[in-house]
Amino acid sequence: MSVLYKNFTQCLIKNNASIKDAMKKMNDIGKGDKIIKNYQFLLLVDKTNKLIGTITDGDIRRSILRGESLNSSVIKATNMNPIYGLEKEYENNNALLNSILHETFFLPILNKNMQVIDALVSDSSYLNKNISVLLMAGGFGKRLGNLTKNTPKPLIKKNGKAIIDNVLDIINKCNLVTKLYISTHYLSSLLKEHVNSRIFKFPIKYLYEDTPLGTAGSLSLLDNKLKENNILVINADLITNIDLNNLIDYHNISKNDATIAVAEYTYKIPYGVIEYSSSGSFLELIEKPDINKFVAAGIYVLSPKFKSLLSLEEVIDMPDLINRGRKNNLAIGVFPIYEEWSDIGSPEDL
């Protein structure tokens, strides 16, 4: 079913805005509106409200992967060839939107002057696919030293709050989650006691690893009936405010078998770096440059095909599983995180 979005004007953004402006506006437009909360988009218009293009969360993230700065023009993150409907043609517009649900979940409505006058939104988009979550919480946390001697790493507190509670909060906010699996090993009883004290919208099942199976091996312990469902795998030692709905939608619309969430990491080389040609001729000396790289953020969406690549209780880490999928010609994409993200790897991170 499709509905007209009465407050569509909050989705309009002018063509002099930046990508950063678009990110903020997209995060703001869903507040207090049940329809748009889970389907955020922007309509790029000129000063007379003529449609220039459309922008989704995925468009913004793809622009980041292309190397665009957040201060770049929003046009760099815009679909400049949008599909649109026409004024007073509700039946045709509804049919058009239904025919393109494999691409998008909304349809700008224009008048004869190509000005935006409305927006049609589907509340039955194919993107709304349910998903199960596997929370990886069985590690020893050795890098934290004595802090994890009697406490599992996910229960270590940062700013007065257990690390795992941050992850559980974003999982609980995701309206697509139907079941949560939690992989445990080290001090599992303490972990279960803490998690069981919380309230969730979905059932929880604990998977106990008799011996550590690596960062991906517990996928082999999941119920066989999940062979038709995607699995979201997330580490229990992250601090992030990512909206998991956006990640899952990105995975589905990209038609990936695996989507790896990545975060930008910057490190400084403490020396002058020499640039030179293939013949050995000097080109440039750069003093202590900053290097930016995308790193795996400990969050993945995997299709059932990845579970089929595992044998029961196989010991394997996630990089090896992802590379195995690559060798089997599975489609693997990346999802850049621009939201808050950090990994608790040392006492200094607390």
Segments and roles (model prediction):
Residues 65, 132, 161-235, 246, ...:
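Conserved N-terminal catalytic core of the sugar/cofactor nucleotidyltransferase
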Residues 254-264:
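A short, conserved acidic/glycine-rich loop-to-beta-strand motif
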Residues 121-150:
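N-terminal nucleotide-binding beta1-loop-alpha1 segment
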